[in-house]
């Protein structure tokens, strides 16, 4: 599966490591470069600095081919907006939002 995760805090980083470890293609988006330190050295996915509702960034990471999208930042509004964009604009089949 190709999975995009928005938010690299405790939840996002653990989810990214788990999915990457199981062989899934994972992209993690976070607003700070510092957050990616949580992923450790074994994470083999892609990391991008930005926000989860930036249309250009989402296109850049290949949201059109994403099988799943997980918005798990610490901000409910960010998660809901990002999830809406993924579902309504890009028709990602499986969309999850942490609220």
Per-range role (PLM):
Residues 1-99:
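Cytosolic regulatory regions of ion transport systems
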